[in-house]
């Protein structure tokens, strides 16, 4: 505490200690009381002014101290900020390059994949088209063959039917001829038998006539086979 402040405090204390001991006559002397009060007020005013100056000085010293510590701190913060900015810039640059490389690689792989599968799909589509064309041609060939076979089968059945009818007609004719032949053969045999019997009768009659004329006798077998 400053000497001026201690002096004002002692004066105020002294006046305060003196006030209770004032005699009742002091109330009858207002001039003395007013003078004493003015002294107290002046001392307090000086004390207030002194206290305000000291506070301003202390505030200035505090500001200087804060500024003294704040300058290195700001410098460190500025350096850290610049370092952080460089690190972030470098990191973002590296990240951007990495992302570009990844995107480029991915794009190249996707293009290669699309080209490979596009080529495979094109070849497969070409093969499917060729197979479908061959299948269509084969189906047309089979259809034509089937129609030809159907036509051939129909013609064969018609020819077979005609031949069966012809065979039936031949069989009927053969049976008719056979029947006629059998009938004619029976008649021929009967006619031949009748002719042989007539010849035998003639020979027997001739033999009988020869016997009558006293010819040497002959056996019946000699007569039959002569």
UniProtKB/Swiss-Prot annotation:
Keywords: Coiled coil. InterPro entries: XLR/SYCP3 (IPR051443), XLR/SYCP3/FAM9_dom (IPR006888). Residues 155-210 form a coiled coil. Residues 21-30 have a biased composition (Polar residues). Residues 8-18, 39-48, 56-66 have a biased composition (Basic and acidic residues). Expressed in lymphoid cells. Residues 1-66 are annotated as: Disordered. Pfam families: Cor1 (PF04803). Belongs to the XLR/SYCP3 family. This is X-linked lymphocyte-regulated protein 3C. It comes from Mus musculus (Mouse). The lineage of its organism: Eukaryota, Metazoa, Chordata, Craniata, Vertebrata. The gene is Xlr3c.
């Amino acid at each position: 505490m400053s000497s001026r402040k201690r002096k004002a405090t002692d004066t105020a204390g002294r006046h305060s200690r003196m006030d209770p001991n004032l005699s009742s006559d002091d109330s009858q002397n207002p001039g003395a009381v007013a003078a004493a009060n003015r002294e107290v007020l002046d001392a307090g005013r000086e004390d207030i002014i002194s206290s305000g100056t000291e506070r301003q000085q202390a505030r200035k010293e505090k500001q200087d101290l804060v500024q003294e510590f704040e300058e290195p701190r700001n410098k460190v913060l500025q350096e850290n900020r610049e370092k952080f900015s460089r690190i972030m810039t470098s990191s973002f640059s590296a990240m951007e390059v990495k992302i570009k490389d990844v995107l480029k690689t991915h794009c190249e792989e996707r293009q290669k994949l699309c080209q490979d599968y596009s080529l495979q799909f094109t070849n497969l589509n070409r093969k499917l088209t060729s197979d479908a064309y061959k299948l269509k041609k084969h189906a047309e060939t089979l259809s034509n063959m089937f129609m030809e076979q159907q036509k051939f089968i129909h013609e064969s059945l018609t020819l077979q039917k005609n031949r069966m009818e012809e065979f039936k007609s031949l069989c009927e004719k053969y049976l008719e001829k056979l029947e006629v032949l059998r009938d004619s053969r029976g008649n021929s045999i009967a006619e031949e038998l009748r002719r042989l019997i007539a010849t035998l009768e003639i020979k027997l009659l001739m033999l009988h006539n020869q016997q009558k004329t006293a010819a040497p006798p002959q056996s019946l077998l000699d007569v039959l086979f002569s």
